[in-house]
Amino acid sequence: TRQTIAQLHGGSWELWNDGPDALSPQWKATGRRTLPDGEQVPVHNGPGESLSDVYDRVQQAIDQAVPLMESGHSVLFVAHAHVLRILTARWLGVDPHFARLLRLDTAHYSILSVYKGDRVIERWNC
């Protein structure tokens, strides 16, 4: 959790401000971990994506969605809230840091659309 990472980092760490690059390289590792049921799973703790990396990546998804939307289709994005908030910021054409101001709860949906030529949030956190 964010609190655990902050504690390991020395008491202060905020994903939106510090990003994954601020974390210690010693936390990066590749190996296998054992789940409570005994199953062994591969684990790769890498540097992660920066906010700008995700912001660029979601543009690719938007680029694929827009032609479908323009031809009358609906498009469904399923992802973690963090990514969906960044996608929304990109959709609106605002700074990616704006995404931290968008609350998106677990198992909720939002609708992004176009209204009078502008990309808008039609519904949020429903």
List each model region and its residues.
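Acidic, low-complexity terminal tails and accessory targeting/binding regions
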Residues: 1-7, 52, 67, 71-73, ...
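GST superfamily/GST-like fold recognition
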Residues: 81-85, 115
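A generic secondary-structure signal
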Residues: 60-68
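Generic beta-sheet signal
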Residues: 73-82
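Alpha-helical elements of the RecA-like P-loop NTPase motor core of helicases
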Residues: 63, 85-86
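Conserved short-loop catalytic and cofactor-binding motifs
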Residues: 42, 46, 75, 100
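Phosphate-handling substructures
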Residues: 1-57, 123
